[in-house]
Amino acid sequence: MPIPLRSDFNASELRALARKTKDGPQARRLLALAAIYDGGTRTAAARIGGVTLQIVRDWVVKFNAQGPE
């Protein structure tokens, strides 16, 4: 069972943050997480982020603990 994302954000908020950031890797992370919020698979999120499933899992854990920063 995948780790669920925190409920105080949504896909559109993360996409807006991704558009505003000047940090390319952060934008990819945010877009990958937005895809998960939209119901996409972790595999699809990994493709968007250009990373492995383990990295996506790490992103989810960090995002749940610290938010989008």
Predicted regions and their residues:
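Short, basic alpha-helical/linker "hinge" immediately adjacent to a nucleic-acid-recognition surface
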Residues: 1-69
